[in-house]
């Protein structure tokens, strides 16, 4: 007999060789039905794995994040199974879990399009209903290679060749087998709420020199209700797509001459200026001096900073006069150069620097997505150089600034995470203990709840991540606060302490909105293009009922502009209904409509974008009304 301890501290006896599914059944049939896998002594295992010794057991169900991930990973296998049934000559490659779903890459011998997805999905449902048990076997590497070679799965052979392990796991359901680390669901019957969503191209291993594969995306949920809710969200997200709204509002465009880099139009630049000016004022409030550093630097700087070894493949490089240069992928090393121009005393610290720095990263073309994933973007970077004793207070201030910014931009629902030490890291455990505690203390001081994520910190220090939830419930990773033990040492960022000794400065990195391009894309989707008054590219559209009011329209327009209102004058010889509809589609917050009565009484009639009639008032009163909203960030 063996003893199994449960999360509530209770201990029960079972026969040796029992599995997690059996344990779940002994508690309740409904629990067994919901069980996807289990943690056995902190190791995630398949639900059918035998337990032969005393252990701690935590069952994983579809309600757990790990359970949902296993469900989705198994659904990716079901997709591959269905594709092989329908297109036997297809080669399968990889099928990982992604946010809210999964994908699988295939090498089809025939042409496949979006129209084929319903057929594949139908086959998936047929296979799931067969309730095929899912099992695995562990085989030597050589046997796994021979197995997949015999099936003509050359990509699987290549994957196995690249893995250092000598033992491979092969999962099987019905007549389909796939290479995988697992774990997987016990039976295909639990896959009931899934849908294939789109199809795209993807190069094998992300290398454009390799074959272009067909990537099929899908989503999978614990219940049909969850699936329906998610699909409704996708439908709403489609309406909010910043690329479509950006075109309607004439904000920006992309073209093949400069892939992944936006061309900003007048209206887009107006939004950009509001975001940048707001952040500049916020930085001033929190004592950050603004700097501007070179876009290009000698490659040796990136070698010293460590970026060359980490980002070389994603860096744009050039040569000039027999010297190697690179366009910066990050702003940090050039900021350190500004710090290093002076000898600093501990009395000078903290020194806070902010930069709206343009960076370039050679992202794969297939990953580019409007403003949300680009090759050139402007980062609202901040770098603080301080003593170890000052770190906690500086992080407290950064957290305060982040929350102020997000609330002003209309994000009131967010999650905060602390990414803790990874296995491979620099620095001793004592330094990491202290650093991680500082981040926790700073969040506690701001009454912020947070989650801990062991192993997800950078090798050079732990970090805080801010995840914002938008109007339709999507989560966006936005700001970061990062402790850095590495770069100050590498680049010689030092100060003289009170004993006259040279010490390495502590360096804090922070980005609040992050990429301005991405943040503006987020804002557009969050507000569905109906930006709050203070951010709207055009705040008021002025129009007359007939051309007889043209002179008065011009007079009102000039008065609005003199009061700092971003106004548009519409003197076209069109019906007033047409003008109202057009400016409503352009998401202009307020429409000023002028007729004979308004002209004679020197007043204006105001209509909100929503269609609400605000009645009549003087231009001065309207400007005061607008200014109050703008100041309140409404």
From Swiss-Prot:
Localized where? Answer: Cytoplasm
As for what it does, the entry says: Catalyzes the attachment of threonine to tRNA(Thr) in a two-step reaction: L-threonine is first activated by ATP to form Thr-AMP and then transferred to the acceptor end of tRNA(Thr). Also edits incorrectly charged L-seryl-tRNA(Thr).
> Corresponding gene?
thrS
Belongs to which family? Answer: Belongs to the class-II aminoacyl-tRNA synthetase family.
Q: Which residue intervals make up region (Catalytic)?
A: 241-532
Q: Which residue intervals define the domain TGS in the entry?
A: 1-61
Q: Give the binding site residues for Zn(2+).
A: 332, 383, 509
| Organism name | Francisella tularensis subsp. holarctica (strain OSU18)
User: One GO cellular component from the entry?
Assistant: cytoplasm
Q: Which UniProt keywords apply?
A: Aminoacyl-tRNA synthetase, ATP-binding, Cytoplasm, Ligase, Metal-binding, Nucleotide-binding, Protein biosynthesis, RNA-binding, tRNA-binding, Zinc
Main EC class of this protein? ligase
Main subcellular localization, coarse class?
A: cytoplasm
Q: How does it assemble?
A: Homodimer.
Q: What is its EC number?
A: 6.1.1.3
Which reaction(s) are listed as its catalytic activity?
tRNA(Thr) + L-threonine + ATP = L-threonyl-tRNA(Thr) + AMP + diphosphate + H(+)
Question: Which CDD domains does UniProt cross-reference here?
Answer: TGS_ThrRS (cd01667), ThrRS_anticodon (cd00860), ThrRS_core (cd00771)
How does the cofactor bind to this protein, according to its record? Binds 1 zinc ion per subunit.
Task: State what protein this is by name.
Answer: Threonine--tRNA ligase
Q: Which GO terms describe its biological process?
A: threonyl-tRNA aminoacylation
Q: Which cofactor does it need?
A: Zn(2+)
């Amino acid at each position: 007999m063996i003893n199994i301890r449960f999360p509530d501290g209770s201990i029960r006896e079972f026969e040796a060789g029992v599995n997690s599914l059996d344990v779940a059944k002994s508690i309740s049939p409904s629990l067994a039905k919901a069980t996807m896998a289990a943690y056995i002594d902190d190791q995630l295992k398949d639900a059918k794995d035998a337990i032969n010794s005393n252990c701690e057991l935590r069952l994983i169900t579809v309600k757990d994040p790990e359970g949902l991930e296993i469900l989705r990973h198994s659904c990716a296998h079901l997709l591959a199974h269905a594709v092989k049934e329908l297109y036997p000559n297809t080669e399968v490659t990889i099928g990982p879990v992604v946010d809210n779903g999964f994908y699988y890459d295939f090498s089809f011998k025939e042409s496949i399009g979006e129209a084929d997805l319903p057929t594949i999905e139908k086959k998936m449902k047929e296979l799931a209903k067969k309730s095929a048990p899912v099992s695995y076997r562990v085989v030597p590497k050589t046997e796994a290679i021979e197995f997949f070679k015999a099936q003509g799965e050359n990509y699987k052979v290549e994957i196995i060749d690249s893995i250092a392990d000598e033992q491979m796991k092969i999962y099987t359901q019905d007549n389909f087998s796939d290479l995988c680390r697992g774990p997987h669901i016990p039976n295909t019957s639990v896959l009931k709420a899934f849908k294939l969503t789109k199809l795209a191209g993807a190069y094998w291993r992300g290398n454009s020199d390799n074959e272009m594969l067909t990537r099929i995306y899908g989503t999978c949920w614990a219940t049909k209700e969850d699936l329906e809710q998610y699909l409704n969200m996708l439908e709403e997200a489609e309406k909010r797509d910043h690329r479509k709204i950006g075109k309607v509002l004439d904000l920006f465009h992309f073209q093949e001459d400069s892939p992944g880099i936006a061309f900003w139009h007048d209206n887009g630049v107006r939004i950009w200026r509001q975001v940048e000016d707001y952040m500049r004022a916020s930085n001033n409030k929190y004592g950050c001096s603004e700097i501007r550093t070179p876009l290009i630097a000698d490659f040796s700087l990136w070698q010293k900073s460590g970026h060359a070894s980490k980002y070389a493949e994603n860096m744009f490089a050039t040569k000039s006069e027999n010297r190697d240069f690179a366009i910066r992928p990050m702003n940090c090393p050039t900021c350190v150069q500004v710090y290093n121009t002076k000898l600093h005393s501990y009395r000078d610290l903290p020194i806070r620097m902010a930069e709206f720095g343009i960076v370039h990263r050679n992202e794969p073309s297939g990953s580019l997505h409007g403003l949300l994933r680009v090759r050139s973007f402007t980062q609202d970077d901040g770098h603080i150089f301080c003593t170890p004793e000052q770190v906690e207070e500086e992080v407290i201030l950064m957290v305060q600034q982040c929350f102020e910014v997000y609330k002003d931009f209309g994000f009131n629902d967010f999650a905060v995470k602390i990414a803790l030490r990874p296995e491979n890291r620099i620095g001793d455990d004592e330094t990491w203990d202290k650093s991680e505690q500082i981040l926790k203390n700073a969040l506690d001081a701001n009454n912020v709840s947070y989650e801990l994520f062991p192993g997800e910190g950078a090798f050079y220090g732990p970090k805080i991540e801010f995840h914002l939830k938008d109007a339709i419930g999507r989560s966006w990773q936005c700001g970061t606060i990062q402790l850095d033990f590495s770069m100050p040492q590498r680049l010689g960022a030092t100060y003289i302490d009170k004993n006259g000794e040279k010490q390495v400065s502590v360096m804090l990195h922070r980005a609040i909105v992050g990429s301005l391009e991405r943040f503006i894309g987020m804002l557009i989707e969050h507000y569905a293009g109906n930006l709050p008054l203070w951010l709207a590219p055009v705040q008021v559209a002025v129009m007359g009922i007939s051309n007889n009011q043209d002179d008065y329209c011009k007079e009102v327009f000039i008065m609005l502009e003199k009061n700092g209102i971003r106004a548009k004058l519409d003197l076209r010889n069109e019906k007033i209904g047409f003008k109202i509809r057009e400016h409503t589609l352009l998401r202009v917050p307020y429409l000023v409509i002028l007729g004979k009565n308004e002209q004679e009484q020197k007043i204006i009639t105001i209509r909100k974008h929503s269609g609400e009639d605000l009645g009549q008032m003087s231009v001065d009163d309207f400007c005061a009304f607008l200014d109050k909203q703008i100041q309140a960030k409404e």
